[in-house]
């Protein structure tokens, strides 16, 4: 077993931390590019794709969460529901994990409550149940 295997949750053939770091750097560039092009929905899709749920390295999860939470905070209130409506169930679950993470910071709570309301409206209580019972965190 090598060092990289030690940082992957057991039972999962996840990526190495180096691969996650490269993915996160690319994700940040793509999110910024989409936002600069006036395409927040594209930025959201990129931000929610392939989160680092299989790593045990908190710094990697924190770095990715910063990208997602900053993106969520940048949405205009009126655009949140429209954006949520385009997401599939897996994306809704991932988004809800980030919403709870954002609420846990105690910062920018009104926008995270708006996201929560819209995700709950579309995904129903099942989204909340899956998120709170899931062991893999973002």
From Swiss-Prot:
A single GO BP: exocytosis
Described function: Functions as a component of the Arp2/3 complex which is involved in regulation of actin polymerization and together with an activating nucleation-promoting factor (NPF) mediates the formation of branched actin networks. Seems to contact the pointed end of the daughter actin filament. The Arp2/3 complex is involved in organizing the actin system in cell motility and chemotaxis, in phagocytosis and macropinocytosis, at late steps of endosome processing, and in mitosis.
Lineage: Eukaryota, Amoebozoa, Evosea, Eumycetozoa, Dictyostelia
Keyword Cell membrane: no
Stored PANTHER family: ARP2/3 COMPLEX 16 KD SUBUNIT P16-ARC (PTHR12644)
Cellular-component GO terms for this entry: Arp2/3 protein complex; cell cortex; cytoplasm; cytosol; pseudopodium
SUPFAM superfamilies (UniProt xref): Arp2/3 complex 16 kDa subunit ARPC5 (SSF69103)
Sequence similarity: Belongs to the ARPC5 family.
Subunit-level organization: Component of the Arp2/3 complex composed of arpB/Arp2, arpC/Arp3, arcA/p41-arc, arcB/p34-arc, arcC/p21-arc, arcD/p20-arc and arcE/p16-arc. Interacts with carmil (via the region between the LRR domain and COOH-terminal proline-rich domain); carmil is required for Arp2/3-dependent actin nucleation. Arp2/3 complex, MyoB, MyoC, and the alpha and beta subunits of capping protein all form a larger complex with carmil.
Intracellular or extracellular location(s): Cytoplasm, Cytoskeleton; Cytoplasm, Cytosol; Cytoplasm, Cell cortex; Cell projection, Pseudopodium
Full protein name: Actin-related protein 2/3 complex subunit 5
Key words of the record: Actin-binding, Cell projection, Cytoplasm, Cytoskeleton
Keyword Cytoplasm among UniProt keywords: yes
Gene3D superfamilies assigned to the protein according to its UniProt record, in alphabetical order: Actin-related protein 2/3 complex subunit 5
InterPro entries linked: ARPC5 (IPR006789), ARPC5_sf (IPR036743)
Positions in coiled-coil regions: none
Location of region: Disordered: 1-21
GO molecular function per UniProt: actin filament binding
Pfam families: P16-Arc
Organism, as annotated: Dictyostelium discoideum
């Amino acid at each position: 077993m090598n060092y990289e295997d030690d940082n992957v949750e057991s039972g999962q053939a996840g990526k190495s931390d180096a691969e996650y770091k490269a993915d996160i750097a690319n994700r940040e560039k793509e999110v910024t590019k989409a936002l600069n092009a006036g395409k927040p929905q594209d930025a959201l899709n990129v931000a929610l794709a392939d989160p680092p749920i299989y790593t045990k390295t908190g710094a990697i999860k924190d770095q990715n969460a910063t990208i997602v939470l900053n993106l969520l905070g940048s949405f205009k209130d009126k655009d949140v529901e429209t954006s949520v409506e385009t997401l599939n169930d897996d994306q809704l679950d991932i988004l809800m994990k980030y919403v709870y993470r954002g609420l846990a910071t105690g910062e920018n709570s009104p926008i995270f409550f708006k996201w929560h309301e819209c995700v709950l409206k579309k995904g129903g209580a099942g989204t909340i149940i899956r998120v709170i019972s899931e062991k893999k965190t973002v």
